[in-house]
Amino acid sequence: LHVDAVGGALKLIVLAPGLKPEYSNSFSLSADLYHNFGRVQTNLLIEGFYTKLDDVFTLVQIGEDADGNFIMERRNASGATVKGFNFEGKIGIPNLFELQLGYTLQSSLYDRPVEWAENSDLPAQRKMFRTPDSYGYFTSTWNIAPRFRASLFGTYTGTMLVQHTFYNAQTDSMQDAETLTPDFFDMGLKLAYTFRLSTSVNLELSAGVKNIFNSYQKDLDFGPLKDAGYVYGPALPRLFFAG
């Protein structure tokens, strides 16, 4: 039983006859550099990676059962290749501040185009779904005072292709589509102060905001005919917190 539900119906997965195991071979090469500039400590990591997938699994919608549930068949595609570069860096002064960030550029392609909906006019697709070509993150901490600390953090997700099954009122039927999502930058801020109650007991009070720019999916499905799997981007809209 697939976890998604579309239009009030479930998605049931069956295995294709002769389904083979999926295998992968991965290679990577990296350089890790460290250097101090006085009190400032730095680190840079550069990595290249390459993964070849053989008989990669794909899900193809092949029809419906008597109860109106979607039947998805798990098949072997010809293969796929995932490759790219990863960059990570750190800079900081001990007991004062620290910044860490990373960024990845990658390509995720099937060897030959794959159809994910047999009864659809959509062309076969080489690009893997839900695999952005770029993504990154950063975290930083600044000790403003001996017991007062600020943290700034964030993640970046580039555009990606997402499958979407929606209700078409003109044809009175469910229709398959591919959506190119926007990119998202989800940034948050946290301030924390530590009170020393005794030599062995501390109390920390904190407050902040997550997803400061309210970078959030704007076209969520609603209603009984929604596609429960059509969700992408940050999990929460702007959120204030304290504790």
Regions found by a protein language model. Give the residues of each.
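C-terminal beta-signal and adjacent terminal beta-strands/loops
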Residues: L1, K52-D54, R147, Y156-F166, ...
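Outer-membrane beta-barrel translocator domains and adjoining extracellular loop/strand segments
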Residues: L1-V6, V56-E64, F70, Q106, ...
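Extracellular loop and loop/strand-boundary signature of outer-membrane beta-barrel proteins
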Residues: L12-P17, F70-N76, E118-K127, S173-T179, ...
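Residues on the lipid-exposed face of transmembrane beta-strands in outer-membrane beta-barrel proteins
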Residues: L19, L29-L33, F87-I91, L101, ...
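Membrane-embedded beta-barrel scaffold of Gram-negative outer-membrane proteins
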Residues: K20-E73, T81-K83
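Residues that define the transmembrane beta-barrel architecture of outer-membrane proteins
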Residues: Y23-F27, T81-K83, P132-G136, D183-M187, ...
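Outer-membrane beta-barrel proteins
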Residues: A31-F37, L44, I93-N95, S107, ...
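Gram-negative outer-membrane beta-barrel transporters
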Residues: N43-L53, N69-F166
